[in-house]
């Protein structure tokens, strides 16, 4: 339904409801940018590291700033009762991973030469679980969560990744890394 409003160059009702003075952005590559394994992509400073992601949507303010938008859906409840999603504190781990995802998308678009807004949004659809019968239909409460992004951290992380990939030393595993524990356990079993 968001694309319908994009074609009409009109605000989606959720934008009006939350006071976002923007419309859907159109770019001739948007359909490619939205595809998994295609996405919007940029090479990082001649390193052969390509950073990409499939953006869900882009909006645009009147001043030309592009707004990154991502869609999430879940069915969140507390004590088996429906729980409204009102801000990032209601999202898994305070939405930290979603905020980082939005900021990486902002950075990619910035590196591609776009005028990118610090504002970014999650359109968060939360399915009601307390219905007696679903009848093959899920009803959702849809909330718009705003995040003021800061992608200044992205290049530092990419530099660290590049250095690690070009190093002859293997870093120590971390107790905070689930995959590290799995690999360590597998190595003990099979080596």
Model-based region annotation:
Residues 1-40, 44:
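A non-catalytic, helix-rich entry segment at domain boundaries
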Residues 2, 105, 180:
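A residue-level signal for conserved active-site and pocket-lining positions in enzyme catalytic cores
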Residues 7, 11-12, 21, 31, ...:
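Accessory terminal regions of nucleic-acid processing enzymes
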Residues 33-156:
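Mg2+/Mn2+-dependent nuclease catalytic core
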């Amino acid at each position: 339904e968001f694309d319908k409003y994009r074609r009409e160059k009109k605000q989606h009702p959720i934008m009006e409801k939350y006071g976002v003075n923007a419309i859907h952005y159109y770019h001739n590559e948007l359909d490619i940018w939205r595809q998994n394994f295609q996405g919007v992509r940029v090479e990082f400073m001649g390193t052969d590291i390509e950073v990409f992601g499939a953006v869900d949507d882009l909006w645009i303010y009147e001043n030309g700033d592009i707004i990154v938008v991502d869609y999430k859906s879940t069915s969140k409840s507390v004590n088996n009762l429906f729980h409204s999603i009102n801000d990032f504190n209601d999202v898994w781990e305070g939405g930290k991973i979603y905020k980082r995802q939005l900021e990486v998308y902002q950075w990619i678009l910035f590196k591609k030469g776009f005028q990118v807004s610090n504002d970014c949004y999650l359109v968060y659809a939360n399915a009601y679980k307390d219905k007696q019968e679903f009848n093959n239909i899920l009803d959702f409460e849809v909330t718009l969560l705003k995040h003021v992004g800061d992608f200044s951290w992205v290049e530092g992380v990419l530099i660290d990744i590049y250095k690690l990939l070009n190093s002859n030393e293997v870093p120590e595993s971390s107790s905070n890394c689930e995959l590290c524990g799995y690999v360590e356990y597998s190595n003990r079993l099979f080596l």
